[in-house]
Amino acid sequence: MIVNNTPVETYELNGVPILVKREDLCAPLPGPSFSKIRGVVAHIKNRPETTIGCLDTYHSKAGWAVAYVCQQLGKQAVDYWPRFKRDGAADAPRVQQQHARQLGADLVDIPAGRSAILYHTAKKHLRENYHDSYLMPNALKLPESITENAAEAVRTAPHLPDSGTLVISISSGTVAAGVLKGFEEAGLLRNYNVILHMGYSRSQDATREYIEKAAGLTLGDRIKFIDEGYGYADAARDASAPFPCNPFYDLKAWKWLSNPTNLETILDGPIVFWNIGE
């Protein structure tokens, strides 16, 4: 269901070798290729309920991940997804919901709105329509996502340089918290500078606080946030990568790294790019 020890491969940017952690390979098809699924597997395995619900967002693969895990474990998935006005009456207009349906999930659309309201609506619908059910935490902020990604970072540590710069794209920061926790457990974090590239603009202080609390770490001044002002629905433009890369997250970070001016600022040691997934 999950692939551990995903490879570290070397790619070049402007003649500079970049070590890329290929977490896009962590879940084979028909699963979604993003490393947050590590925590989804562990979390659902520990739930006794037979029906597992999940709230999706505009470009989230959360419902797809939950549907994949539920199919593997013999549970029923329910994917709640936001219907925008531009969707009209289209049935499952986005590919991630189509994949969830193919894996056996029930699809329930909710008029798009604020995430907290959508989550409350989904929870109420699930409770009223599905016996023995459970709704996954919003944004899949799972403690298991931290512990499982930390474990993968520890497994990867022997294949990485003893020092350098780590570049990670972040949304909520859950996966990054796990990776940083793993680097700390492996004795690497003290020797690494860390660049957290924000997939969309929001409070850096709140994001740092969440990551530090989730990882049980004090990050200090070696952690640098890069906020290029992206909106949540913005995809990277005029950018490509030589490996599968999510246009809403990792590809933005790769595009930033591809800029020679940005790359020059971190050329004081090896560079590790943690590709969370496609």
Curated annotation (Swiss-Prot):
Single Gene Ontology MF annotation: carboxy-lyase activity
Catalyzed chemical reaction(s): 5-C(alpha)-glycyl-dTMP in DNA + H(+) = 5-aminoethyl-dUMP in DNA + CO2
Biological process terms in GO annotation: symbiont-mediated evasion of host restriction-modification system; symbiont-mediated suppression of host innate immune response
Lyase keyword on record: yes
Keywords: Decarboxylase, Host-virus interaction, Inhibition of host innate immune response by virus, Lyase, Restriction-modification system evasion by virus, Viral immunoevasion
Alphabetized Pfam families for the sequence: PALP (PF00291)
Family to which the UniProt record says this protein belongs: Belongs to the pyridoxal-phosphate-dependent aminodecarboxylase family.
Function: Converts 5-Calpha-glycinylthymidine (Calpha-GlyT) into 5-aminoethyl-2'-deoxyuridine (5-NedU) as a step in the pathway leading to thymidine hypermodifications in the viral genome. As a final result of the pathway of hypermodification, 5-aminoethyl-2'-deoxyuridine (5-NedU) substitutes for about 30% of thymidines in the viral DNA. These modifications probably prevent degradation of viral genome by the host restriction-modification antiviral defense system.
Protein name (record): Glycyl-dTMP PLP-dependent decarboxylase
Organism, scientific name: Pseudomonas phage M6
Lineage summary: Viruses, Duplodnaviria, Heunggongvirae, Uroviricota, Caudoviricetes
